Amino acid sequence: MAWSDRAVRADPSDVTGLVRHRCTALWLAAALLAATLLSPATAAAAPQPWNGRYQMITYASQKAGTSPASRQQESDFGAVFTLATQCSGNRCVATVIDGPRPGNPTIPQPTRYAWSGSEWASSYDWLWDCFLGEGNQKQWARATSWASYQPQPDGSLKGTWHTDIAEGACRGSVVMPVAAFPA
């Protein structure tokens, strides 16, 4: 008997059982898919709050990128900041609530970092103050920056600060490692 003959001569009660089995399997798969889609991932739903005092460091001595500014010598810099996290629904935001103001007045304040599911991230538009050498006036240029900090097992956070400078003598990108350590 050929395979096609067996399929044609199937017992009707066997077909009903097979259909019932497949429907049950499909129903269970749909229920599992719905449960997965309706419950957010643990990392996204429950970040470790970023609260308290942190020594935040920008490793400017290690900067890279395509902007001429990325090749200018600069020392690492940092300060102690206090952050507080607030969550609403499935969105958490850590806000800098205390610490020194930036030297550049165009950087939006306060700084806020949103939890993405794996890191704290911030982005903002501002004006880069392009250093053109001793005795020359700085050139202000439109820029967009984003910083990300990934929590580490030791309680610190490490990441990157990336700036795209849109115009002028410093046009290009500047990328620097960043870190935050409990203070």
Outline where the language-model segments fall.
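Secretory targeting and sorting signals
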Residues: M1-A45
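Tryptophan-anchored aromatic micro-motifs
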Residues: A46-Q72, L157-W161
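A short, structured loop/turn motif at beta-sheet edges
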Residues: A46-R53, A84-R91, Y113-W120, S148-L157, ...
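Beta-turn initiation residues at beta-strand->coil junctions
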Residues: T58-Y59, D98-G99, Y124-L127, W161-I165
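Flexible, membrane-facing loop/turn or short amphipathic-helix motifs
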Residues: S61-Q72, D129-K138, I165-V174
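Predominantly extracellular/secreted and cell-surface proteins with exposed
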Residues: R71-A143
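Internal, hydrophobic beta-strand segments that form the core of beta-sheet-rich folds
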Residues: Q139-I165
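Edge beta-strand at a domain terminus
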Residues: S156-A183
